[in-house]
Amino acid sequence: MSRSPNTLPAAILGLAIVSASLVGAVAVERIRRGGDEITVTGSATRAVTSDLAVWRLDVVAQDRDQLAATRASAAGATATRAWLVAAGLPDSAITTRAPTTFTQEEWVNGSPTGRIVGHRVSTQVEVRTPAVDLVATLAADPAALLDLGIPVVPQSPEYLYADLPAIRGPLLAEATLDARGRAEEIVGAAGARVGRIKAVRVGVFQVRKRQSTEISDYGMYDTADREKDITGVIRVTFAID
């Protein structure tokens, strides 16, 4: 008896379905036997508002004479500090760093001549304060310092969350509960139960701007935005009862 050309694909498809069913049945039976384990990843996210601002301002002066450049930079740093205090920041929140000097050499036809033509001195003033909103307001108007004749180059403020160490534990606990819930969904259909924790691997924390989907394998810490999402990830291996 000859086999119709249309019956062969149907037979193969039927065999594949039966094979898949057998594989699924074996997997379910293995879970039901107990002694197996399941590894799942859980995560938890918490929305936070930055509670610490770090703002650095570089006061730069340039002169042929190194001493003159150093004095001009120091005077500018003092004026910058006074302006910050007058704006409402406590003096204790402000730090003036040691000056950094750069020597400027003369170049002719792409080569240095060895002759010193000037000195560039930079003194950094750093603000570290919980007054996040005030720093954001001051940083939004850098012309206010330039209008005073202060040769300052302000950097973008960094917005941090100082209480991050305090919430790491609770966040990982929530992530562990999330992992257990995922495991229960997976093994529940097989009539098995999730048992004790056998192994835990804590992942990196992601501190991102609010509602961002950006992640990094090495963790990330967004400092540009005041409103952030902090996500903790944990990989848990459970015994299956």
Language-model segments: residues:
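Short, charge-dense linear interaction motifs
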Residues: 1-241
